[in-house]
Amino acid sequence: MTNEEPLPKKVRLNESDFKVLPREELLQRWKQFEAYVQALENKYTDLNSNDVTGLRESEEKLKQQQQDSARRENILVMRLATKEQEMQECTTQIQHLKQVQQPSVAQLRATMVDPAINLFFIKMKAELEQTKDKLEQAQNELSAWKFTPDSQTGKKLMAKCRMLIQENQELGRQLSQGRIAQLEAELALQKKYSEELKSSQDELNDFIIQLDEEVEGMQSTILVLQQQLKDSRQQLSQFQQQIQTSGNRTPSSESKDEGETSGKDCGRILNGPSNGGSSHQRTHSSVGLYREGSSTEEDFSASPINEGKLPNHSEERTSRGGSSYMNQLSTGYESVDSPTGSENSLTHQSNDTDSNHDSQEEKPVSGKGNRTVSSRHLQNGLDSSVNVQGSVL
């Protein structure tokens, strides 16, 4: 039976009903009464069960609250104990400090007996007496200078004080104005000085930029000259090899003339490293000269007349050509290593080579027949090569 179902009606029986009513009707009413009692009992049991669960839940909550409160109480008790301990420690420290600050009679006697403290107290007494004397003098002076409002001296003194105060204020204004003007002048000077510094800094920056450009140009020229020096050294080694081979093949005077011409060409190559094309042309001209010299050697090999005269003359010419060749090499290296003086060295060496060439042209060449013709052809070839090299330079 649930709460939603209606309760059965209550049956009431009297003694008269027991006597009057038949048995069947009594049984029926009795059953109704039993049903009513059963419904009440069920309802009571339901109510009891709900109350028990609620009471149990409330009991658990109360127990938990009691545990929490007990835990808090323990924590608070511990805190209280720690606070009391701290209070006791503080009181002991305060008592100790009081005992330390309150010296004993023995300490006071010891301090009074100390001579340094005695001297200190004597000085303090002397200073106190001096201050008292000064105070008395000041009070006496103040009482002497006192005057009534109607006294003429007091009025004059006040007027003088006002005038002095005004003069002091005016002097302060003048000093402040003069200081401001001085500061303005100094500020103008500093501005002018800063502008001059800025202009000088700009000039220095421009000068530094120019120097950087010049340095870059000089570095590029140095690199070019170093490359040309390397090329000239390679060409020089080639010419030396050619000279050695020609010296081994031709011990006659034509080999000496060839050495001189090749030395001149090498000197001109070293004197003019600024043009790569000219060095190439010079190598071709020297090779042509070498070929012409070899042809003249073949022509002169058949003439037995001048065999005795050739060795001495050729030795002299080769020694001269070798010395001039070494001088030209040294001057050429110096001119290439120093880029600033390359132009002067070029002009100087070109003049030297021209003078040597002219002096060698003036010397007579001993020979007959085909030898004189070949030497003339050789000199004409040298002249043409020198003219070509001069035009290139």
From Swiss-Prot:
Organism from which the protein derives: Xenopus tropicalis (Western clawed frog)
Assembly description: Component of the WMM complex, a N6-methyltransferase complex composed of a catalytic subcomplex, named MAC, and of an associated subcomplex, named MACOM. Component of the MACOM subcomplex.
Homology family: Belongs to the fl(2)d family.
Protein's cellular compartments: Nucleus speckle; Nucleus, Nucleoplasm
Keywords from the UniProt entry: Cell cycle, Developmental protein, mRNA processing, mRNA splicing, Nucleus
Keyword Cell cycle among record annotations: yes
Designated name of the protein: Pre-mRNA-splicing regulator WTAP
Biased composition (Basic and acidic residues): 254-267, 310-319, 354-365
A Gene Ontology biological process term: regulation of alternative mRNA splicing, via spliceosome
Polar residues composition-biased segments: 272-286, 320-353, 369-393
Its job: Associated component of the WMM complex, a complex that mediates N6-methyladenosine (m6A) methylation of RNAs, a modification that plays a role in the efficiency of mRNA splicing and RNA processing.
Region (Disordered): 240-393
Any Pfam family hit: Wtap
Chief location of this protein within or outside the cell: nucleus
Lineage: Eukaryota, Metazoa, Chordata, Craniata, Vertebrata
Annotated Gene Ontology cellular component terms: cytoplasm; nuclear speck; nucleus; RNA N6-methyladenosine methyltransferase complex
